[in-house]
Curated annotation (Swiss-Prot):
EC code(s) of this entry: 5.1.99.6
Binding site for K(+): 49, 127, 168
Top-level EC class as recorded in UniProt: isomerase
Annotated NCBIfam families: yjeF_nterm
Annotated binding of (6S)-NADPHX, by residue: 48-52, 131-137, 165
InterPro entries the UniProt entry points to: YjeF_N_dom (IPR004443), YjeF_N_dom_sf (IPR036652)
Cofactor dependency: K(+)
Protein name according to UniProt: NAD(P)H-hydrate epimerase
């Protein structure tokens, strides 16, 4: 996928920033197909998947959604997240550009550990923590989400879940679980073409949509 993106950029068909914007637009466009939630909770990791998440957050906020972003690795852009952790967003990337745009347009960010503060209700959770590059165990990253989710479920919340490209906790290339409890998505919005993991997700009843973001020649 990265080779395809690099080829599209080298050919002048799109910039990385344009591709990220299109990806976020595709995810945001999928949301109206579901019952309208009261609240969108967007989870952003430190890479390009997280950059997509910041685009989604901005676009949903522009449609008058109440949007709360919870993130990991973005302390340089959002000092309120606390001391930097071991994994941080790389300066100069398109993801950082979109995180700053979210901040500059009035958006805020809270640490993942604050997720349990969200009151139970009608909630859309957008998973943009890890994307196609994930290959390592990620239980620690997902633990705050599952702690919050279990509380919402006990309180009778109506929770809908959407993952950007690949649910956090799965290897994109072989579908192997990288966490004891990978993120459970109702819908996955992927880009350009399905990845090997999507066959496993479909077999488990997950809806997978593939969006055209202009990578074809």
């Amino acid at each position: 996928m990265r080779a395809i993106e690099n080829a599209a950029m080298a050919a002048g068909r799109a910039t990385g920033l344009q591709l990220m914007e299109r990806a976020g637009e595709a995810v945001a466009a999928a949301v109206p197909d579901w019952p309208a939630p009261r609240l969108a909770v967007v989870l952003c990791g430190p890479g390009n998947n997280g950059g997509d998440g910041f685009v989604v957050a901005r676009l949903l906020a522009g449609r008058d959604w109440q949007v709360h972003v919870f993130a990991s690795g973005w302390e340089a852009v959002f000092p309120e997240l606390g001391p930097p952790g071991p994994v941080r967003a790389r300066e100069g990337t398109d993801a950082v550009t979109n995180a700053r745009r979210w901040r500059d347009e009035g958006g805020s960010c809270r640490p993942l550990t604050a997720l349990a503060e969200v009151e139970a209700g009608r909630i859309l959770v957008v998973d943009a923590l890890l994307g196609i590059g994930q290959t390592r165990p990620c239980d620690d990253l997902l633990e705050p989400y599952w702690r919050a989710r279990d509380g919402w479920d006990r309180a009778g919340a109506e929770v809908r879940t959407l993952s950007v490209d690949v649910p956090t906790g799965f290897d994109c290339d072989n579908g192997v679980a990288l966490a004891r409890r990978p993120f459970e998505a109702d819908l996955v919005v992927s880009f350009h073409a399905e990845k090997p993991v999507h066959a496993r997700l479909r077999a488990a009843g997950v809806t997978v949509a593939v969006a055209d973001i202009g990578l074809s020649s």
